[in-house]
């Protein structure tokens, strides 16, 4: 399975070769994927080459050849720059961006309260970080008082690293989208632009700590440029 960034880079190279016959430069790839440095592009290209999706042609500058595409990629699909909610399951086809949620109008002549439709974006790791793949699976109707104002999405939890915070494998967490968090808040964090996880946010000096709520898991420390908050926990749904 390719990570989201690997998919994006493969598609970007493929589309550029189709359009111009010339592979993109490292600067163009870095800009297209919104990465901070070329080293991230080098890692992605190496991973794609090891998996048999591309090859580098010897003795030629900027020489890349796409050998194959994942079966699930729709024809003509183009990569998107920005990250939406981090998920792992569902189709690896067209990337779906989260749209702001709005209350659904109640039927006329009905006393039923309005609900808010929240996109369920697949599953998020509450354990070892897993590949971040974006795909909306379905919509979830919630009472508006459960989430309040703002843009929200839902994720199904996979893993047991947050059990001491009352978050269990199979639960559905409601996330308010945002890129900041206060120490102690539970967040969806994107690590190295590729992996997503649900953890408690802490600061360790200039570094960021992603803290599990299970003693079986170690707290992981990252430089501030390696972690990007994608939203924070505001609700939880459990089915029995």
From Swiss-Prot:
Substrates-to-products reaction catalysed: Hydrolysis of Ala-|-Gly bond in repressor LexA
GO biological process: DNA repair; DNA replication; negative regulation of DNA-templated transcription; proteolysis; SOS response
Keyword DNA repair attributed: yes
Residue numbers marked as site, Cleavage: 126-127
Single Gene Ontology MF annotation: serine-type endopeptidase activity
Enzyme Commission number(s) from the entry: 3.4.21.88
One Pfam match: Peptidase_S24
Regulation of activity: May be constitutively autocleaved; RecA is constitutively activated in this strain, leading to continuous transcription of recA.
Active site: residue positions: 161 (for autocatalytic cleavage activity), 199 (for autocatalytic cleavage activity)
DNA-binding region as annotated in the record: 26-46
Known partners and oligomeric status: Homodimer.
Protein role: Represses a number of genes involved in the response to DNA damage (SOS response), including recA and lexA. In the presence of single-stranded DNA, RecA interacts with LexA causing an autocatalytic cleavage which disrupts the DNA-binding part of LexA, leading to derepression of the SOS regulon and eventually DNA repair.
Protein name, entry field: LexA repressor
Lineage: Bacteria, Pseudomonadati, Pseudomonadota, Alphaproteobacteria, Hyphomicrobiales
Gene from which the chain derives: lexA
């Amino acid at each position: 399975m390719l990570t989201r960034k690997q998919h994006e880079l493969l598609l970007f190279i493929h589309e550029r070769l189709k359009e111009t016959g010339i592979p993109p430069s490292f600067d163009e790839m870095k800009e297209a994927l919104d990465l901070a440095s070329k080293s991230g592009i080098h890692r992605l290209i190496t991973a794609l080459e090891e998996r048999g999706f591309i090859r580098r042609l010897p003795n030629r500058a900027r020489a890349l050849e796409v050998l194959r595409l994942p079966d699930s990629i729709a024809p003509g699909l183009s990569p998107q720059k920005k990250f939406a909610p981090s998920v792992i399951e569902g189709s690896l086809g067209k990337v779906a961006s989260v749209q702001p949620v709005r209350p659904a109008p109640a039927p006329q002549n009905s006393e039923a309260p309005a609900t808010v439709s929240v996109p369920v974006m697949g599953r998020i790791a509450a354990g070892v970080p897993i590949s971040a793949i974006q795909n909306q699976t379905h919509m979830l109707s919630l009472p508006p008082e459960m989430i309040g104002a703002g843009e929200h999405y839902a994720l199904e939890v996979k893993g047991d690293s947050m059990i001491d915070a009352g978050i269990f494998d199979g639960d559905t967490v409601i996330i308010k989208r945002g890129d900041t968090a206060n120490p102690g808040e539970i967040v969806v964090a994107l690590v190295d632009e590729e992996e997503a996880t649900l953890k408690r946010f802490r600061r360790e000096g200039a570094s960021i700590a992603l803290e599990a709520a299970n003693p079986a898991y170690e707290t992981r420390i990252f430089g501030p440029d390696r972690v990007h908050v994608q939203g924070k926990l505001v609700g939880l749904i459990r089915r029995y």
